[in-house]
């Protein structure tokens, strides 16, 4: 290809238009622009080459590797249409044409680019040369589209945990690495949540889930560990704060057509009796705004069985339908299809949790001594719980507890 062809095809991307916003690809486009400019000055060309290579080398020395990853992770209207089984012939032709060009671009070297521009490569002999290799991008991209239900596309291919900011999903780059295998105890309770999640992943009817119980019993850790465990199967977690509940219907609309499965996670949920967020959650759980998409479930944790903070003032108010109002508030938890209770561990369960954690952390202290010290630690910490057990074991590991 001649230089003007490289430049025109790069600037003429339609399906993969978003690539031009990628810092490395943008620098490559600037380099081809510089080469095509009627200017024999060497310094601006050196600047363009060096700027591109500096951007590329921050990630890899191989242009083909970088471009192939960028292409496979870019969210396009073609992959969205294909995921919905609606890819038109026009879009398919445009997709294949651009993939063919991008495949050639993966193999482009600096010397080949200079040759296409009729420039002498010896002029830039002092500059490093990036590596390049052609890949079968068409086959790889078609495979990615077929696997969109598990691997996703765009930011969903790179991340599996998200938060919400100003109504938009924001990836969490370093999510909690909690594993199910690291959560001893509460296996029966946890299995109910896992079974419901598997149903969601299978496309079967799945319940909204309320994980209720004492603080530190592993409710939040269970949800996060499940998200990590099943990320490779197409599960994504969206953490929603209580003051963002009103945004959930819009989030559901955004995610309903996505081939992945989503848990909308509300941690430490509770309401006061006059909380506007109560009505928002009620509408979501009842589906009054519309039918809930089968690829989405709401998981919430709470220390309160009925989610409502009741005060004496609430009970002595002037609501003439006080009993009905209180019952309405109390019944919110019943609108979750599945409620799983995590109670404080009794002594035997606490001991079993400690023993398993001690094995995981390679604590050598005799078990009887460990239990005595852990019980004393739990009294000072406010009572037995898996969180307290973990804190104690970590202190043993660090040498604080001897």
Features from the language model and the residues they span:
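Conserved catalytic/switch belt of AAA+ P-loop NTPases
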Residues: 256-257, 272-319, 324
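Pre-Walker A (pre-P-loop) alpha-helix and adjacent loop at the N terminus of AAA/AAA+ ATPase modules
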Residues: 175-208
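Conserved alpha-helical scaffold flanking the Walker A/P-loop in AAA+ ATPase domains
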Residues: 198-199, 243-268, 279-290, 323-327
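Conserved nucleotide-binding/hydrolysis micro-motifs of P-loop NTPases
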Residues: 244-246, 269-272, 298, 302-308, ...
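Walker A/P-loop
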Residues: 208-238, 250-256
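C-terminal alpha-helical "lid" subdomain
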Residues: 343-402
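Conserved AAA+ ATPase "SRH/arginine-finger" region at the nucleotide-binding site
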Residues: 318-330, 337-351
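AAA+ P-loop ATPase mechanoenzymes
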Residues: 1-184
